[in-house]
Amino acid sequence: MAVYYSIRPQLAEIPAPKNEDSQSSLPHIIIMTPEEAANGTFLQTNMYVKLEHSQEVRFCKAEAHKDFLYGTFVIPPKSNNREKIAFRYLIAKDRIIFIEDGGFVKHMIDKMQQAILRENPGIGFFFSDFLDMLISEDLLYLTEIENQIAHLEDEVLAGTLENFNHKIMACRRKILVCSHYYLQLSDISNILQQNDHGFFTRNELASFRLFSERVGRLHEEALMLREYSTQLREVYQAQIDIRQNKICLLYTSPSPRDPKTS
């Protein structure tokens, strides 16, 4: 069943209205399943069915349509036991609708409900807070990747080269996914800042700019990790070359002559 929140200084879950036309004038959040979205009057009016069936959720994006913003999120896994998370969203003048089928968005909003208070709440502030929550633990995750690379570096310098390529490629794949993710989030923020529909106040636009700066720093961190991993691969290759040279010398060096036979 769809879940409704009223955007107040502190987010508050509210009962579902009997029909969509009876919703209050206060800005609000709705979380619904794809099935509920396909049957919703507001979403049908705004051509959600056409959008839903014509586009597969593959990456993070935002699109400006006539009277609303529509987009998708794909959150990359940040642990070994979690798959990527995908959901859709729609932003209108007085509401934000999330379409998901797994409970991730509700979990995030429940965390925001406990942690965030705003004197002047609005849909723009809510969405910027939501974006911030998405990346709140990413620096820690990037630090974990850095520690993994540093551990590999210690192994290489100690002469332990077993499964190095497999391990470093796993790190580089994580870095690449994060790098693309941050660029996509930056694109979303840029589209929000254009404010084509006039949904957001000046202060809300400033909060999107701050998010852009945060995600930009994360992207820079990912690029530095990629460079670190590249340098480590070069060190590893140098170690391999040294070993191969020693083996070649062993087989090509003349054996010492026996003085008795000379």
Residue positions per predicted region:
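N-terminal low-complexity segments that are often proline-rich with Ser/Thr-Pro
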Residues: 259-262
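Extended amphipathic alpha-helical scaffolding segments in membrane-proximal extra-membrane regions
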Residues: 74-242
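Soluble-to-membrane junctions at the N-terminal ends of transmembrane alpha-helices
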Residues: 240-250
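Helix-boundary and N-terminal cytosolic regulatory elements
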Residues: 1-118, 184, 188-194, 200
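Conserved small/polar residues in nucleotide/adenosyl-binding loops
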Residues: 251-256
